Every structure is written in structure tokens, then in C-alpha cells.
């Protein structure tokens, strides 16, 4: 019994995700696909537009055989920590043999070479990066420009491609924890990441979200698997959409409650950024205005939004220090994959639970992370058009389709 792992957000699930799951099974020869999915918040620093249970069910109905939750400290993190959290869950689950991911280049060997460069940066390359940062570039832009100046074009290009960057970090994470997972790059088809263009039955998740927010939901039907469109229509105006603006005042309130020292302890706050946040949240009452006031070439908007979401949720310190707090929360499985769940219980190095009552299996640090996950679900629920009672997300049984 072979399984391939995928780390994803499915925000929302679309035809490109179904294609990736199909190709991942084909390329790996796996019988099952295990998806590690971000929960209530995603890497762009926003709440997931649709609640996690609905997104998990969409994945199970369209190629995934099991969906595991990626805890918020890793879902709301840089590419490095996001990848490390997902890879650690897959590796310690004991049931994944490989990890597949979308890639602009589709060349696993090239990504291996890129990972080697990051793990062994020459002093000259480091100096170029520092020089670019001193000119006001964000770290990702400074690094990409330095690589463009220092590396062969073919190798440098992968550092400017969002999915390739994640692929590189998956490979680095595998090496970092000495995992046996085999990385498999799946060439992207259709449109680029975050593109507003369409190609056949494909468009980006960001374009689908844009169409939903602008009231043009009827235009997304061609780009999502059959059945999901009706699901979306049934929840829009009730449990969706959840957006950053939906939690605007709550986020500004959370920022205003914090001292400069507390702001400094948030993940990714460096170089005096706490001073800018401290001033901006006292000048503006809207999170969009706060972000605009703080934004500069040095900080990407995604990074700033992640910091603000961490303030709202009470996430402090580096996610790298939370690896020993991980547990495996199974959101759902396919009925035909019951044997996969049995194998998970047998082989996992981490506590496994499928219902809230199983939290007694967790140690103190894992219980703290579990409490954070409950808090994230409760806060995300406040952003719904019809807010939900607390802990409602954890009161449901395991999804079986």
C-alpha cells in the first residue's frame, strides 16, 4: 500500500487541484493520496474563504483519500516553516512514501540543485542579498535578484516562481528532518499562480476568490469540479465568504492591546517593524489602512498580513520551535481508504485523533497547540456572515465520503 502526500490550502478547491491529485498518484504509483491542508487561516495571511470541513470534503470527493489539518502556526508562516510543518506531519504519519507538489519548472532535479544552493550559500551570494536588502527590497525580492545576478538563468528562474520556491522548501525540509519522502514535481498546467487569466477549465484560486467577492460567482462554474459550485452557492451569505476585512476591527483591537515588546515577539517581526505596527494601529481603525501605512518595499504584503493574523490569534515566537507540539488531526477520509486510517493509527509517531474527545492523548505542549487551534476556529467563525458558536468546528464527526 503506497501513499503520496500533498500539502495544500484548497482555498477553494478547483480543477487544478483535482488535476494535481490525479497526476500525483500516477507519477508516484500510489494507491492513496494524503492531503495536509491549512485549516482556518492560510499562508497569504488571511482567513480561508470557506471553512475547513467543507474544503476537506471537496478534496475527498475529488481525488484525496485522507485530509489532515496543518496547524495555524505553520499555515500562517513563511514558505520555509509552512513546508517544514507539512513535511513533518507527512513523515511522522508513517503512511506517506512520497510528496508531490505543483511546480512551474516541473523538474525535481533542478529543484534539488536549488535546494543545495540555499543550504550552501557562498559568501558572495550572501553579500549580494544583503546589498539588495539595504536598497529597500523585501527578502524574497532581494534573494531572487541576487540569484539572477549570481546563478545560471535556468537555476535562478526557480527562485522567482512561487510553486518552485515551495518545492525547494519541501526538499530542504525533507533533508532537515532526515525524512524518507521522495519529492515529485508536477508541472503546472493552465495558468500561473495568482493569475486572473483562464485557460480551458483552469484558473487560479485567487481569481476564483476575486470572482466570488465581486459577486460574479456564476463565472466560476467551469473552473471547479462538479458539485462544488452548488455547495458554494448554498453557503455564500451564511458561512462564507470569510475575508480579512471580515475580522478587521478584531485584528486592529488585538494589535492595539499589545505593547511594542509583545509586537516584537510575533513571528517575522524584525528590524523595528514593531514600531511601525504600534503607530499605525493607533492611527487607523481599519486593518487595510494599517497594512497600507506599514507596507514598504522591504516587507511583502503577505508577510505583514501573516503578522497581523498572528496578533489576532495569539501566535508568538518561531513556528520552528513548535515542531515538537505537532499532532495529527484527521479531518476526513474516503470510505474506500479505511485501511489507510488503520495504518495511520498503527504507524504514526505522533498522536492521532479524529474527534475532540481524543485530546486526552496529547501532552502539555500538544494540548497548548490544540487550544490554539480551537481558538483559531472560534475567531474565524466570527468572520462568517452568520457567526457560529464556539467550538462548533470540533463538535462534528470525522468526514467520510
Q: Model-predicted segments: where are they?
A:
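Generic alpha-helical scaffold signal
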Residues: 49-53, 61, 77-84
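N-terminal catalytic cores of NTP/NDP-binding nucleotidyl/phosphoryl-transfer enzymes
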Residues: 1-55
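Active-site cores that bind ATP or allylic diphosphates and position pyrophosphate for catalysis
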Residues: 69-401
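Non-catalytic positions within long, well-ordered alpha-helices that form the structural scaffold/packing
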Residues: 25-26, 60, 87, 91-92
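Receiver (REC) domain switch/active-site residues of two-component response regulators
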Residues: 31, 65, 97
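Short, contiguous strand/loop micro-motifs
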Residues: 8, 42-43, 59, 73-74, ...
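A glycine-rich helix N-cap at a beta->alpha junction
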Residues: 56-71
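Class I S-adenosyl-L-methionine
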Residues: 25, 56-60, 172-175, 209
Amino acid at each position: 500500500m503506497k501513499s503520496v502526500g500533498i500539502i495544500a490550502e484548497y482555498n477553494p478547491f478547483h480543477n487544478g487541484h483535482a488535476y494535481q491529485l490525479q497526476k500525483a498518484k500516477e507519477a508516484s504509483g500510489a494507491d492513496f493520496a494524503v492531503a495536509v491542508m491549512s485549516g482556518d487561516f492560510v499562508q497569504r495571511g488571511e482567513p480561508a474563504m470557506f471553512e475547513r470541513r467543507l474544503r476537506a470534503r471537496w478534496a475527498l470527493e475529488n481525488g484525496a483519500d485522507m485530509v489532515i489539518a496543518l496547524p495555524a502556526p505553520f499555515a500562517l508562516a513563511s514558505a520555509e516553516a509552512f513546508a517544514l510543518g507539512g513535511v513533518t506531519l507527512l513523515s511522522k504519519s508513517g503512511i506517506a512514501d512520497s510528496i508531490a507538489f505543483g511546480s512551474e519548472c516541473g523538474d525535481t532535479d533542478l529543484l534539488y540543485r536549488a535546494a543545495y544552493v540555499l543550504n550552501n550559500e557562498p559568501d558572495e551570494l550572501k553579500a549580494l542579498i544583503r546589498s539588495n536588502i539595504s536598497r529597500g527590497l523585501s527578502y524574497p525580492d532581494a534573494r531572487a535578484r541576487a540569484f539572477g545576478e549570481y546563478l545560471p538563468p535556468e537555476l535562478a528562474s526557480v527562485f522567482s516562481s512561487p510553486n518552485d520556491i515551495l518545492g525547494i522548501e519541501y526538499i530542504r525540509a525533507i533533508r532537515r528532518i532526515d525524512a524518507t519522502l521522495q519529492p515529485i514535481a508536477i508541472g503546472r498546467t493552465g495558468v500561473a499562480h495568482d493569475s486572473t487569466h483562464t485557460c480551458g477549465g483552469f484558473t487560479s484560486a485567487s481569481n476564483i476568490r476575486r470572482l466570488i467577492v465581486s459577486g460574479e460567482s456564476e463565472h466560476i462554474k467551469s473552473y471547479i469540479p462538479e458539485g462544488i459550485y452548488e455547495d458554494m452557492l448554498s453557503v455564500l451569505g451564511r458561512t462564507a465568504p470569510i475575508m480579512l476585512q471580515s475580522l478587521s476591527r478584531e485584528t486592529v483591537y488585538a494589535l492595539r492591546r499589545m505593547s511594542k515588546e509583545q509586537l516584537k515577539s510575533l513571528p517575522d517581526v524584525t528590524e523595528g517593524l514593531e514600531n511601525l505596527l504600534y503607530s499605525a494601529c493607533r492611527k487607523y481603525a481599519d486593518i487595510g489602512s494599517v497594512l497600507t501605512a506599514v507596507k514598504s518595499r522591504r516587507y511583502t504584503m503577505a508577510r505583514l498580513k501573516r503578522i497581523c493574523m498572528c496578533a489576532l490569534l495569539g501566535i508568538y515566537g518561531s513556528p520552528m520551535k513548535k515542531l515538537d507540539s505537532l499532532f495529527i488531526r484527521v479531518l476526513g477520509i474516503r470510505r474506500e481508504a479505511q485501511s489507510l486510517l488503520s495504518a495511520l493509527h498503527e504507524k504514526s509517531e505522533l498522536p492521532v485523533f479524529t474527534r475532540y474527545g481524543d485530546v486526552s492523548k496529547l501532552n502539555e505542549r500538544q494540548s497548548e497547540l490544540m487550544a490554539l487551534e480551537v481558538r483559531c476556529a472560534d475567531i474565524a467563525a466570527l468572520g462568517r456572515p452568520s457567526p457560529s458558536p464556539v467550538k462548533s468546528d470540533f463538535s462534528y464527526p470525522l468526514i467520510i465520503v
